[in-house]
Amino acid sequence: MKDLNKTIGVFVRPTHHQNALFKELEQAKEWVLTLLEDEGFESFMIDSLDGAKDAQLIKKAYAFLCLGGDGTILGALRMTHAHNKPCFGVRIGNLGFLSAVELNGLKDFLQDLKQNRIKLEEHLALEGRIGNTSFYAINEIVIAKKKALGVLDIKACAGHTPFNTYKGDGLIIATPLGSTAYNLSAHGPIVHALSQSYILTPLCDFSLTQRPLVLGAEFCLSFCAHEDALVVIDGQATYDLKANQPLYIQKSPTTTKLLQKNSRDYFKVLKEKLLWGESPNKKR
């Protein structure tokens, strides 16, 4: 079979051998490859985060099956983002907020995929730039202190207009899809995953008046820190940000693409995965 629409890349995070679920992942990987063949799909494995190195291989796939948790899906989405390829997650692990299906439901999902009974969700992604270095973020870009002590001053601009100076441990710039990740842990708002906006949430801000801010995605943002800082991408990659060096962030021209069941409902996922609106005493 040479049909591009029948070719699925299987992504397992390259550090999975360090995972407590290593044995389960290895067994699941072999089972998944066999199932794909039985269902009439061509498949290949990718266990690297180097999208440039695997560019030709990535182009061969219609979509990518991400075997693991949300971290695995985030890594795959960044790796394939420039190639405009959709991904879907098969959960092995704990939360699985982004996952499309459990392992025991994969066969039905693949059959629905063949019959075009799967929906494609397109989400806003961030494109960041420091000097000549560009990168994509699916959940968030974080500007964080390099030093354990002291306060980091971050000047924020929308276009050429300064609108705030944050003084604290740092700043989260999240996507709506990422609003339920680090942003939520830092007491930022939940924003519907299909919205077109940025969420700016300060980390341990020095001022009582600072609150999270939601901005329309039409803005091009820039940030400067008064001293050397770290820029963290989806909690997985880091870049150095020199004092007074601008970090530019804008809406990526390419969307984050996730394949999901037609029956998936965002509010239901919030309730099931995060116990949204439930009593704190309710047992899962």
UniProtKB/Swiss-Prot annotation:
Record-annotated active site: D70
Cited InterPro entries: ATP-NAD_kinase_N, ATP-NAD_kinase_PpnK-typ_C, NAD/diacylglycerol_kinase_sf, NADK
A biological process term (GO) from this entry: NAD metabolic process
Catalytic activity: NAD(+) + ATP = ADP + NADP(+) + H(+)
Source species, domain of life: Bacteria
Chief location of this protein within or outside the cell: cytoplasm
HAMAP family referenced in this protein's UniProt entry, alphabetically: NAD_kinase
Protein family: Belongs to the NAD kinase family.
Protein name: NAD kinase
